[in-house]
Amino acid sequence: MEKALSKTWSERFDKGLNPFIEKFNASIEFDICLLEEDLDGSIAHARMLGIQGIITKEEALRLENGLQQIRKEASDGLFHPVISDEDVHFAVEKKLIDLIGPVGKKLHTGRSRNDQVGTDLRLWLRKRIDEIDMDLVRLQKSLFLLAEENLYTLIPGYTHLQRAQPLSLAHHLLAYIEMAQRDRNRLKDVRKRVNISPLGAAALAGTSISISRKITSSELHFQGIYSNSLDAVSDRDFVVEFLGASSLIMAHLSRLSEEVILWASEEFAFIQLTDRCATGSSLMPQKKNPDVPELVRGKSGRVFGHLQAMLTMIKGLPLAYNKDFQEDKEAIFDSVKTVKNSLIAISILFEEGLIFRKERLNQAVSSDFSNATDVADYLVAKDIPFREAYQLVGRIVKTSLEEGILLKDIPLERWKTFHKFFEKDIYEKLLPSSVVESRLSAGGTGFERVQEQLLSWREKLFN
């Protein structure tokens, strides 16, 4: 069994770790993702130690140069931590001492891995939030360009997955742009709480060494510092919040994916999948499968699961730091990867992976009773109480269904038997384009309202 002295913390121990426990305990295989942030945090800490006179300026410079050398070696593929290094923090410290000698042992003055890892994770997540925001913008732009082309293209609108009222296709696509904007706003809000520095809180109680937390906070471009050291090292609210925001992103993508899957089916046939974003069957040569939206729909469960896992993990933890926190990294790393890849895949799908079948869409909005509400509105405009008009139109629809005809095919003489107020202009009101055009309330699908929204979104997204 290896000797305890091979570990940074092992002076307290007589025997080394069981090899299985050593591997079980180590996080280096995944927290190596934090290397850049660990180096950034350590450089800021070294500079602060020099400024405060805790170490000499020459020592601070040697520490910084050594850390930059590690960065270069990592970039060149020459930095290879092993399981016995335990985590990214010890791997860096060990390498630093190898490079610059005993002065490397001064780097950890006035800090603990507890505040160090919290700093690293916040720095890493801050970057990823900014990247995801740009991925959301790409999705918004992809949807917008399709919406702009399809202001006057109509698509059936549904409630309970039953035909309800016709919509401008642009209006439908803009709904998802609105969802993405809420996702962006949530991430922006989460970022505020990510962007607080725990560095200098040490293990849990602060330190007796005359460090300056404000200097390191400023060096790392944090907005401020935690005011309570216990809270600083034990807070993972920002992880839960990020996973919550990510879960909503995936929920929105899953809803959009479900619609694409339905639209691509023979039963709907609203879109045609291009070869760029579809695959075939190993058995059935006629198939073209919507793999991209199906995968995104399936991947949403991964992110939901990580959120639940984090909530379960933190709910029973006493203050302050606990080894349980090691589990936050794989959850957040995988969630970031899943969200980013899903956003990019769906953006590509709408950029080059589908074509709306306009003839089929026109057929769909022209062959149902989704204009029935407009018959009621027609009567309301003639001073018939809405509920009375609603009940009358319900009887008209029932009769039409029994006779196998659409409202547009009812002769005018028959209309007049239902109510004397029906005139020839009822046929114009029944046109799908007229139905959509009439929805001029704020936020409605009327062409005028949708055009206003398109102009507004073009200004937001492209200027």
From Swiss-Prot:
Catalysis: reaction(s): 2-(N(omega)-L-arginino)succinate = fumarate + L-arginine
Similarity remark: Belongs to the lyase 1 family. Argininosuccinate lyase subfamily.
Protein name listed in UniProt: Argininosuccinate lyase
InterPro entries: Arg_succ_lyase_C, Argininosuccinate_lyase, Fumarase/histidase_N, Fumarate_lyase_CS, Fumarate_lyase_fam, Fumarate_lyase_N, L-Aspartase-like
Associated pathway: Amino-acid biosynthesis; L-arginine biosynthesis; L-arginine from L-ornithine and carbamoyl phosphate: step 3/3
GO molecular function, one term: argininosuccinate lyase activity
Native organism taxonomy: Bacteria, Bacillati, Cyanobacteriota, Cyanophyceae, Synechococcales
GO cellular component: cytosol
EC number: 4.3.2.1
Source organism per UniProt: Prochlorococcus marinus (strain NATL2A)
Gene this chain is encoded by: argH
NCBIfam families associated with the record: argH (TIGR00838)
Keywords per UniProt: Amino-acid biosynthesis, Arginine biosynthesis, Cytoplasm, Lyase
Compartments (UniProt record): Cytoplasm
UniProt GO BP: arginine biosynthetic process via ornithine; L-arginine biosynthetic process
